[in-house]
């Protein structure tokens, strides 16, 4: 799939994924998300998912995630700019207005957008604002289709996995009501625990007090963060990497819906990824069904060396 820059906005270019001479697929449902979902390029292309990139600034330079670099390239930029905290910008209501027109013009009849945690970005609210005004401002599109917006309630594979499943459903010919019912049910039930190996970025972003980060690094203390119900909190603290992985596996296995699929999120460390996957497999009796390598949204606040488990919670958890 070739990336085509379709429009130029005030401060940056917004790429829209199109194919030259694109032929509309059998499904007229368009599944859209943003780059904080950390969906792999392979799944993006296989299931016809449209992923909107976030603009990112490091120092005095601006980039577009997934366009100017992949995840490894972003980690390298972080290493090259150790004193700069990457900053992400929102996707604007104007951009969503243009996006909706493009999708309807392409022949799609139902647009489903799943956004990054709405407490972490104004992107969700901008998508809703554009939707609420769209058919009034563009009456020529009235009756052409529907637009539905979902809060991803988290980051990375926490909503990236449900987006992939929704795209699979669309490819299988499921009706839009079935897909939206699935998303409405699953998104609030997704939880993630992830361990942070270096506290510098968490301190810079304000997730952890600077003094606590200095002491924690000196003592080898590794925090386990929980993302749940739009909130990010420090859930546990462990001393040493082995205890960190064991604790995450214990807690995740205890809280997840028995027999349900789970995923591993990770950054630059494949060894820790594989060790955590092995511990989870031992705990629950089956392997993770997907892996999500974190991009700018999580790495900017936690650093590139993180690893975690994302799962669907059981009712009482």
Regions found by a protein language model. Name each.
Residues 78-79, 104, 170, 203:
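Hydrophobic residues in alpha-helical segments
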Residues 8-12, 34-37:
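Short N-terminal leader segment in a subset of presequences, especially plant chloroplast
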Residues 9-25:
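Short, Lys/Arg-enriched N-terminal segments with co-localized hydrophobic residues
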Residues 30-95:
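N-terminal glycine-rich anion-binding loop in soluble enzyme alpha/beta folds
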Residues 82-84, 90-132, 176, 180, ...:
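Glycine-rich phosphate- or other oxyanion-binding loops that anchor nucleotides, phosphorylated ligands
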